[in-house]
Each structure stands twice: as C-alpha cells, then as structure tokens.
Amino acid sequence: MPETEDPATGLFIKYLSNNRIFRDREVLRHSYRPQILPHRQPQIDTIASILAPSLRNETPSNILIYGKTGTGKTASVRYVGSELEKASSTMGTTCRIVHLNCEVIDTQYRVLAQIAKCIDDVDEASSDKAKIHIPMTGWPTDQVYSELKNQLDTGGGVLVIVLDEIDKLVKKSGDDTLYNLTRINSDLKNSKVSIIGISNDLSFKDFLDPRVLSSLSEEEIVFPPYNAPQLVDILTQRAAGAFLDGAIADGVIPLCSALAAQEHGDARRALDLLRISGELADRDESKQVTDVHVKQAQAKIETDSMIECIATLPTQSKLILFSMLTLEQLGQNIFTSGEVSRVYQDIAPEIQLDILTHRRITDLISELNMLGVINTRVVSRGRYGRTKEMWFDANTGKIREVVLKDPRLNGLKDLDINQMETKWLKTWFR
C-alpha cells in the first residue's frame, strides 16, 4: 500500500472524494419506486377502479396485464397496491397485497407456500396462534392449499395476489396453480381473493385451459411501449434526483430516449443507458455526462447482453462459434459456412462431441445471426453458386472467454492451432 494512502479508506478514497456526477444513482435503478409514474395514469386509474370494490369488502375482478419489458407494468401495479393498502388502513378495512415473481417462484407448491408466508409478514391482525408456517418443501400440495385457505379465512378481508411474469409459471408448471387460485373464493367463508397476472408474452394464454383463461382474464389491460418524448419525461424526472446540477449535457437525455425508443420503448433500457453513461463519466473524472458517454454505454450494454446470450447457448452452438474464432485467429476476418463446418468437423472429435450435419450447422449459424452474435450475408460466386459469409463485430476476446467456460469446451484452451493449421493447409485451407 502506498505510504500516503489512508488505511481506513484505502484505494477507494479518490473515487469517493471526487464525485462530480451523481447525487443518488439509486434513483436510476429498476427497483426505485417514484411517487409519480409519467404517462401511465390511464392504466393506473383503470387498475384502481377494478380494485376499488375491495375497500367495500367485495371481490374485485381478476386482471391480466400485458406489455413489453420496461413499459411500467410492475411499477404501476405496485403503486396502486401501495395506495390500496393505505386507503384500507384509513378506512379500517382489510386489504392485503402479495406480489410474487414467478420467474423465481415457479411451482404450485412454492406459490401457495409463498402466499401464506407473505400473509404472515403483512397481516398484523392475525395472532401467533392463527399464523401458520408452511415449509417451502415437504408437504402434500393439497395440505398446503388447505392451510392457505384456513389462514385466509382467519385474516378475513380481501387479498390481491400479483403474479408477475405469470407466463413463466404457466410454461413450467402448467395451469393447475391458476385453476386452484381462480376457484379458491368458492372455498372461502370470511375472505376473498383477486388475482393480477402480469406478462410480456401473450402466447402463454395458449397453454391455459379455456375455463382458467375465462376466470383469469375478467379484465385485460395493455401497456403500450413508450415513445421517445415520453422517455424524455421519465428520464428528466429521474435525472433531477440522480444527478448533481449541471452534470448532464443537454443532448444526453434525448439521445438515451431515442436509443431506447428503438428498443420497443423500453424505459428500463433508457434508465440503464443514463445510469451507465453517468458511471462512465464518473470513472473518467469528467465534469459532465456527454453524448460520447452515452454511445460508450450503448456499446457496453449491447456487449453485456450478447455475452449473457452466448453463455446460455447449447454446447454445439458454442463449438460453432469456437470454430469461427479459430478461423479468425488464423487471420481470416470473414469466413464461409463451408469453412466453419470443416473446422467444426475437425475440432468436435477432439472433445468427443457428436458431429452435426452441414445442414444443421447452417441452421445454428442462422440462429447465431438472428441473436446478433455474428453478422452474415449471402454472396454469389458465379458458377460456384451462392454461399453465406459471416464475421464478428463484437469483442472476440470476450466471446472466446465465455465459450470456453462451457465445461465440455474447456479442454480447447490447449488446442494446438498451429498443428491444426498445418493439417488444413495440406487439405483444404486456403
């Protein structure tokens, strides 16, 4: 450690003492809940009007909410839910909200158990004797369902169950959970249940029994994508709390908004762009966030998204990518599907991987192009016909690093490229 460095703060002191950009960067996080949601008042009013009967101890209609990622669905539902609980407390009624993320809680057992747990957490009226503690595994599902009904009737009032990313639950576990929840009111004596399903995938309805769909979609609300001017309003509101005065150049918010509007009006993307732009400016010790930082942030987000996409690819697709990386390592920036196929066929036996047909390899190359991992074009070679050429635009070092993290491909780190090149030169490599 340098002699001048304060041991209490260490190497972080210079990063903490030179803040010229942020007032509170948490305001730009997805988890931040603003008091006002610009351009979502019509949807908020509709949700509130549907849930209002719960304040009279009446059963609200079930709601299905649709919209692409970053269109304010979850934030609007959370806002209305918070206001409903405040109104309930003021009026002396019992209205409770349980919010479940079905990407994590994705089985019938876990959904029922988590609802019971959340009721325990929020229901101060229930006595310790009335409270139940359902384990997250181990009970028969019908016992969990029975205990949940008992707890609901003990607490009374109205419970609104929000199933965020409901499509993930349906696709993994079928519609049994929704079937039971949409019919639970017929088994309750002293309480009532309403369900709000949130999804960015309309196709999940195809997996539902018509009776379940009819009960679940008593009301449907669509959240349209934000346009660029609306995103400007959202970012301007957040920026006031997130950045110090004068820390943002004039063109930054319009540029972030325009870029995010191209990505189907995603407010989350716009917020990420603005936050990362600020972080890059902060690290550079710049006095202002500029358009240059926004463009750097855009490139970083696209790279990070692509790397995450590559990490989830099947092993065969990763090996095809590795074959392209090998060609590039040998000096080729553009390669044909035939060249990639031949390198792949030579490398696959090295790691005891089944060799795919050329047709299947071509299909996987098309998928990689569709995902934005590579670029392709079809070119004519006269009497030799047409062929597909491909190349990388992204940082191939990062792609290689992610590909080789696959346990099946890890051994390729030690592949002797020079030896392989000698073999190819003797056979086909030009």
Swiss-Prot record:
GO terms for molecular function: ATP binding; ATP hydrolysis activity. The keyword ATP-binding applies. Keywords: ATP-binding, DNA replication, Nucleotide-binding. Coiled coil: none annotated. CDD domains: AAA, Cdc6_C. It comes from the Archaea. One of its GO terms (biological process) is DNA replication. Belongs to the CDC6/cdc18 family. Involved in regulation of DNA replication. This is ORC1-type DNA replication protein. It comes from Methanoregula boonei (strain DSM 21154 / JCM 14090 / 6A8).
